[in-house]
Amino acid sequence: MHCLPLTLLLLLLCSRAEAEEIIGGTESKPHSRPYMAHLEILTLRNHLASCGGFLIRRNFVLTAAHCAGRFIMVTLGAHNIQKKEDTWQKLEVIKQFPHPKYDDLTLRHDIMLLKLKEKANLTLAVGTLPLSPQFNFVPPGRMCRVAGWGKRQVNGSGSDTLQEVKLRLMDPQACRHYMAFDHNLQLCVGNPRKTKSAFKGDSGGPLLCAGVAQGIVSYGQNDAKPPAVFTRISHYRPWINKVLKQNKA
């Protein structure tokens, strides 16, 4: 079964999978998700792309490793990404830290830290998001939330405004059709009997369970049928802490 990474590629000329967006969700209340980051990316193939991400320190954003590029500009404090507001903060990424074991074929270890050129100013529209502890286990059946600027329809375009959707954490067996799925590294998210999912353009965004980031949008099926695969943050807390410490975050 063909899978595709959830990176919102705006030029659909390459054979790579694209990013995810929110399908079956609703528009977020403006600035109710102050940790959300919109990433504008010049890819390694010189294409334009976009992803989601989230602020975890004033100068660090967490996202998916498949969102890496030659150049990344981060916008914080946005709701409608096409209408600039006084709440916006645009910050250049000066260093990218993809996980050293990231595999571009299997999309395992699909996690990356981005160091910003300047520290963000924390406001009502810009804030940080707490991460799952290392040994935190979120049981199947838990309802969580995902937000992003991705597509709202399989054949549609990306959303200008931030969208969000409630998704159910599934038993790992529900993702057994994904050959590279590893429940130790990843989460299986989205009820296959529903039409709600993250889709193209949502890659890198957070999965929130009880106000804590438990996952990162990674990949799903090219028809957006759930479940999709999310990177399990708790597994990577030692690596995240190491990078932050070494870079004085």
From Swiss-Prot:
It is found in: Secreted; Cytoplasmic granule. It comes from Canis lupus familiaris (Dog). Its EC number is 3.4.21.39. The active site is at H66, D110, S203. Disulfide bonds join C51-C67, C144-C209, C175-C188. Belongs to the peptidase S1 family. Granzyme subfamily. Its main location: secreted. PANTHER family: CHYMASE, KALLIKREIN-RELATED. CDD domains: Tryp_SPc. GO terms for molecular function: serine-type endopeptidase activity. Residues 20-21 form a propeptide. The keyword Disulfide bond applies. One of its GO terms (biological process) is protein maturation. Major secreted protease of mast cells with suspected roles in vasoactive peptide generation, extracellular matrix degradation, and regulation of gland secretion. This is Chymase. Residues 22-245 form the Peptidase S1 domain. It comes from the Eukaryota. It catalyses: Preferential cleavage: Phe-|-Xaa > Tyr-|-Xaa > Trp-|-Xaa > Leu-|-Xaa. Keywords: Disulfide bond, Hydrolase, Protease, Secreted, Serine protease, Signal, Zymogen. GO terms for cellular component: extracellular space. Residues 1-19 form the signal peptide. The lineage of its organism: Eukaryota, Metazoa, Chordata, Craniata, Vertebrata.
